[in-house]
Amino acid sequence: MKGSTVHTKWQAYCRLMRIDKPIGSLLLLWPTLWALWLAGRGIPEAKILVVFVLGVFFMRAAGCVVNDYADRHIDGFVKRTASRPLPSGTISEKESKILFVVLILLSFGLVLTLNSMTIWLSLAALALAWIYPFMKRVTHLPQVVLGAAFGWSIPMGFAAVSESLPLVCWLLLLANICWTVAYDTQYAMVDRDDDLRIGVKSTAILFGQHDKLIIGLLQLATLLLMVAIGWLMNLGGAFYWSILLAGALFTHQQKMIAQREREPCFRAFLNNNYVGLILFLGILISYW
């Protein structure tokens, strides 16, 4: 019985950290890899690569924990989130706070192996991870904060590799924010009815009937910014082909969200993993 209880608890911790749902980690990983390869104009130093990849998974897990802690009193009223560990009582509030601290300490321990510029930038990453879950209570634009949080590994990556923050770094961050707002609006469309009922704010609610158009414009902005980055970095044809393929995926996503149905909107959100992967492959091949 004791072994069964331990197993159940472990499963609950894994669910709290979304280990069973890696899509968030992947959407955080791709822009991190974009930045590391662009900053180093090719394969980055092995130590830096390992630190950032591990950091992605630790910080994403920490972000999920603080998100669920912030939403612990409302998740029980949303069909998709009612069974999460905190609202269901499988994990206590104290246990979630301890887990968050452990994950942050692990992440900061990794950052301490890098240069001082990266260490200072990591403090902003922590602040963004902490405040994002609470933004949906005060603004209809929490997705913009999420974009900054998911993209903050970009200036950190440039700082770690080159100890500089060039124009390309900020263009890449802006592209990632546009992309994140687009795909997280798709995600928010899944919960829009529940969010309206319980008073949670999101871009899906703010954009209303213009949601598909604005998502399309954000996707276009992402692609145009990527073209500018390719030109500034003198990337090869493979990168521009990857932009075209990403555009094709965005077009496919528009078809999926056309009727604003929950399941297709969620599939459109998941499809963004391939966008990030394809753009990374374009950068990778350009420096081959």
Curated annotation (Swiss-Prot):
Primary location: membrane
UniProt keyword annotation of Magnesium present: yes
Keyword line: Cell inner membrane, Cell membrane, Magnesium, Membrane, Transferase, Transmembrane, Transmembrane helix, Ubiquinone biosynthesis
Residue spans crossing the bilayer: 23-43, 46-66, 98-118, 141-161, 163-183, 213-233, 234-254, 268-288
Entry keyword Transmembrane: yes
Gene3D superfamilies cross-referenced by the UniProt entry: UbiA prenyltransferase
Domain of life (superkingdom): Bacteria
Catalytic activity: all-trans-octaprenyl diphosphate + 4-hydroxybenzoate = 4-hydroxy-3-(all-trans-octaprenyl)benzoate + diphosphate
Cofactor(s), names only, from the UniProt record: Mg(2+)
Pathway(s) served: Cofactor biosynthesis; ubiquinone biosynthesis
Record's GO cellular component terms: plasma membrane
Family annotation (NCBIfam families): ubiA_proteo (TIGR01474)
Record family assignment: Belongs to the UbiA prenyltransferase family.
Function noted in UniProt: Catalyzes the prenylation of para-hydroxybenzoate (PHB) with an all-trans polyprenyl group. Mediates the second step in the final reaction sequence of ubiquinone-8 (UQ-8) biosynthesis, which is the condensation of the polyisoprenoid side chain with PHB, generating the first membrane-bound Q intermediate 3-octaprenyl-4-hydroxybenzoate.
Name of the protein in question: 4-hydroxybenzoate octaprenyltransferase
Organism whose genome encodes this protein: Yersinia pseudotuberculosis serotype O:1b (strain IP 31758)
Lineage of origin: Bacteria, Pseudomonadati, Pseudomonadota, Gammaproteobacteria, Enterobacterales
